[in-house]
């Protein structure tokens, strides 16, 4: 199964003070070893905005240039708005970018690797699948 790795996992893994054996780091390593990891521009943008040192930004650009990228279409944006509204009606708060990331996973048949609990709540109300780390 192809995996989209969310900003929350990348940022934990790239922090200098992150424990090397954190569940998120272990899952990211496992996902990368499967060679079935994809990304999207929004996730790279969020990471680049969050890390100021130029060396760290260069490392992010280098890592992300090796990954296939999925790009949202107009239909994905419309479907993401619908998904967000569905979640909101169910009492689940999902941000605009998170709704689009979830929709990309649904559109491209991807599993999402995330440390963000909002996605767990959203997955109860849509076809979003979360990566369990059991392999591809």
Named regions from a protein language model:
Residues 25, 40, 44, 57-60, ...:
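A general structural signal for well-ordered alpha-helical segments in protein cores
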Residues 10, 44-47, 119-120:
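A generic structural signal for short hydrophobic patches within well-formed alpha-helices
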Residues 102, 106-136:
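Acidic, PIN/NYN-like endoribonuclease modules and their adjacent C-terminal/linker elements
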Residues 6, 40, 93-95, 116, ...:
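Histidine- and aromatic-rich ligand-binding microenvironments
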Residues 1-39, 49-62, 136:
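Short, well-structured N-terminal submotif of metal-dependent ribonuclease cores
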Residues 68-115:
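Active-site neighborhoods of divalent-metal-dependent phosphate/nucleic-acid chemistry enzymes
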Residues 6-7, 47, 80, 105:
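Generic structural signal for small/hydrophobic residues in well-ordered secondary structure
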């Amino acid at each position: 199964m192809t995996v989209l790795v969310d900003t929350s996992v990348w940022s934990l893994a790239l922090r200098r003070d992150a424990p090397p054996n954190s569940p998120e780091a272990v899952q990211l390593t496992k996902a990368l070893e499967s060679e079935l990891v994809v990304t999207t521009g929004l996730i790279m943008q969020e990471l680049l905005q969050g890390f100021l040192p130029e060396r760290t930004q260069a490392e992010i650009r280098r890592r992300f240039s090796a990954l296939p990228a999925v790009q949202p279409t107009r239909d994905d944006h419309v479907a993401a708005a619908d998904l967000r509204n569905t979640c909101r009606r169910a009492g689940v708060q999902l941000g605009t970018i998170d709704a689009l990331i979830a929709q990309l996973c649904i559109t491209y048949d991807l599993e999402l690797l995330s440390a963000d609990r909002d996605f767990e709540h959203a997955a109860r109300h849509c076809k979003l699948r979360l990566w369990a780390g059991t392999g591809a």
